[in-house]
Amino acid sequence: MVKIGVCGPVGSGKTALIEALTRHMSKDYDMAVITNDIYTKEDAEFMCKNSVMPRERIIGVETGGCPHTAIREDASMNLEAVEEMHDRFPNLELLLIESGGDNLSATFNPELADFTIFVIDVAEGDKIPRKGGPGITRSDLLVINKIDLAPYVGADLKVMERDSKKMRGEKPFIFTNIRAKEGLDDVIAWIKRNALLED
């Protein structure tokens, strides 16, 4: 089982990305999802209502506190959810774990996630990639979402591209508009090539 952590600020499109990935990949892969919210299971409920996956393949974890603690310093609740999901589905191939909305420093405990996708959106401004932080610099894949909003918020995608290259070196990043499925195929191709080790 490959575990991919998906993190990023509130409203960046983490849940939308996971919903789109399950919709396009679950017919070919045995998949499940774990979501994290501080006080509710709102993202898990959204997934249950909007995903093609059955409810038993989605677990919502209420962290009750700082979102990055539940995925990094004390990942015990999430590790229990991973174990429960594996017990339910022993042949699970791909598990997507969504963090609660957090800042640019969010990273996953290596025991919890084999790969990390960090999601930001252009509505935060084109300065976000150059601000750095572990989410920007250390994630395996950076997804820059909501590119359709760039002209409305004064964000320059060329600046974001330049700064992403500078901050990430050789690590990949993908521009997306998940709502319109723009860039989604590139994210799926990255997962297949890097996480699932397919050609």
From Swiss-Prot:
GO molecular function ontology, one term from the record: GTP binding
Statement: the UniProt record of this protein carries the keyword Cytoplasm: yes
Protein name per its UniProtKB record: Urease accessory protein UreG
Subcellular location: Cytoplasm
CC per GO annotation: cytoplasm
Organism this protein belongs to: Helicobacter pylori (strain P12)
Keyword annotations of the record: Chaperone, Cytoplasm, GTP-binding, Nickel insertion, Nucleotide-binding
Lineage: Bacteria, Pseudomonadati, Campylobacterota, Epsilonproteobacteria, Campylobacterales
NCBIfam families: ureG
UniProt function note: Facilitates the functional incorporation of the urease nickel metallocenter. This process requires GTP hydrolysis, probably effectuated by UreG.
UniProt-listed GO biological process terms: urea catabolic process
